Amino acid sequence: MRSIVLLSGGLDSAVSLACSLQGGEVCLCLTFDYGQKAAEREKKAAAALAAHYKLRHRVIELPFLKEITSTALVSETSELPAAEEEELDENEASRSSAALVWVPNRNGVFINIAAAFAEAYRCDLVVTGFNREEAASFPDNSPEFVVAANASLSYSTLNKVRVASYTQGLNKTEIVKLGMNMGVPFDLIWSCYGGAEKMCRRCESCLRFIRAAKTAGLQLE
């Protein structure tokens, strides 16, 4: 299988990239800059991961997404929501946090852009880094979303590009363990909503990664 991989530089996308390489050829890694606070760190992490695996990497800029949303991910006046570890498995708390960082149709936009590259490069798959934990609060991480996206792509691409997510049925701990087994370079990953010198260790993305690493026996700096 030939793939275009959506690579944000985070845990899920890094492990999904490694999975893609085991299952076939990765033609291109795509990273999106939509004005998010972590954009520079994500681009740096994604570029480092692509270089590690000796793959082509391209950044696509989508400034309009920042213009049309007030999400805390991009807003200069809104603080990123902090979380507590004990809240990570509480559906109501997770949904409230998700609403604060929601970007309109973000994954839909990403997948359709990647599908255009996939069709042009005669690739079979667009690979995304979804996971079971966040599917409950982010509907565009869910298996139903992938099914719907594939139904749409079967009409909008002549070669019937499909979306695949090798991590979608796994929780974060399982994803870390899978990455450890495949030798994923965790030191290159950026799993934070913020763009400071170091990960904040307070946002939901950080806390999920830290908890998973601890449970899986992965030491973080």
Curated annotation (Swiss-Prot):
GO terms for biological process: queuosine biosynthetic process. ATP binds at L7, S8, G9, G10, L11, D12, S13, A14, V15, S16, L17. Keywords: ATP-binding, Ligase, Metal-binding, Nucleotide-binding, Queuosine biosynthesis, Zinc. Pathway: Purine metabolism; 7-cyano-7-deazaguanine biosynthesis. Its EC number is 6.3.4.20. Binds 1 zinc ion per subunit. Catalyzes the ATP-dependent conversion of 7-carboxy-7-deazaguanine (CDG) to 7-cyano-7-deazaguanine (preQ(0)). Homodimer. NCBIfam families: 7-cyano-7-deazaguanine synthase QueC (TIGR00364). This is 7-cyano-7-deazaguanine synthase. It comes from Pelotomaculum thermopropionicum (strain DSM 13744 / JCM 10971 / SI).
